[in-house]
Amino acid sequence: MTPEYFLRSLLMMILAVFSANASNWLYLAKLSSVGSISEEETCEKLKGPIQRQVQMCKRNLEVMDSVRRGAQLAIEECQYQFRNRRWNCSTLDTLPVFGKVVTQGTREAAFVYAISSAGVAFAVTRACSSGDLEKCGCDRTVHGVSPQGFQWSGCSDNILYGVAFSQSFVDVRERSKGGSSSRALMNLHNNEAGRKAILNNMRVECKCHGVSGSCEVKTCWKAMPTFRKVGNVLKEKFDGATEVEQKKIGSTKVLVPKNSQFKPHTDEDLVYLDSSPDFCDHDLKNGVLGTTGRQCNKTSKAIDGCELMCCGRGFHTEEVEIVERCSCKFHWCCFVKCKQCHKVVEMHTCR
């Protein structure tokens, strides 16, 4: 494959990413690298309707690989968090990558938008701290001595830069259209909730200095939570998401709980407009793979149990042989040696 052909192919894929759906940029996760976007002329060829994205590309060529990594993080975390649910974040080789699931105003779409905006903020911030980007570095506003008496030092994660870039890049489609439709307001709210899942869970990491670890001096820095922590927080918000509707207060359109008996949602909560399908049956047109063939837990009464996972269709049971580590022993010094044991277990899959 010639460099020219590769570049043309890459441009066609990225052009598709910036069309139609606001979450189509997630398709960048399926590209091995976007390093070929290294000249402003390349960005000019992105003839998508959102010119501000083209301008961002031109001004931030080096950041695009972090956007790709953010998309990968988002998809991987979504698949982990929903691994035991009927909808398990399966991706398609088409646009949008989650199918039409994200084009509906469901709570699943709310999670996808939140984890995606968080993924970009996280990946860009990590690139800043790693010294991979010229435009940003560590957070130099964190310095001096803290009220607790330790010295701020090291490389504090520049989360504000990552959040600002995520806002500019991820929110651009909704904001370019005025951001006043019900769906635009929903997307913008969930995008921000995703970023707040990082901001509100920043932690302080420290290192002791002194003779024999006496900690005569302690230096600390601010660090982002793990992305697994971010995913856990947003999954909890998904479980307690608020169904909303649009209401006009004065000249401003806002989202309010559809049930007036419910308390107003906060900036950290996820919101949705439409009820979710049951995800039971195969419907590739809408990006729903169904649950036929999915593994289930025979003894569980939760959503991963065979009764709920299989939507009442029943399940198959077969015996399979697995190999696992066993009889592990620690040997001085310093390794663990295990045997391989063969074990026959029952595996249950939905009809």
Curated annotation (Swiss-Prot):
Residues 1-22 form the signal peptide. Palmitoleoylation is required for efficient binding to frizzled receptors. Depalmitoleoylation leads to Wnt signaling pathway inhibition. GO terms for molecular function: cytokine activity; frizzled binding. Glycans are attached at residues 88, 297. Induction: By Notch signaling in the pronephros. InterPro entries: Wnt (IPR005817), Wnt4 (IPR009142), Wnt_C (IPR043158), Wnt_CS (IPR018161). It comes from the Eukaryota. GO terms for cellular component: extracellular region; extracellular space. Pfam families: wnt. Disulfide bonds join 78-89, 128-136, 138-155, 206-220, 208-215, 280-311, 296-306, 310-350, 326-341, 328-338, 333-334. A lipid is attached at residue 212 (O-palmitoleoyl serine). One of its GO terms (biological process) is neuron differentiation. Keywords: Developmental protein, Disulfide bond, Extracellular matrix, Glycoprotein, Lipoprotein, Secreted, Signal, Wnt signaling pathway. Expressed in the brain and floor plate. In the developing pronephros, expressed in the proximal tubules and nephrostomes but absent from the pronephric duct. Its main location: secreted. It is found in: Secreted, Extracellular space, Extracellular matrix. The keyword Signal applies. Belongs to the Wnt family. Ligand for members of the frizzled family of seven transmembrane receptors. Plays an important role in embryonic kidney development. Acts downstream of Notch signaling during pronephric kidney development. During early pronephros development, patterns the proximal pronephric anlagen to promote glomus and nephrostome formation. Also required later in pronephros development for tubulogenesis. PANTHER family: PROTEIN WNT-4, WNT RELATED. This is Protein Wnt-4.
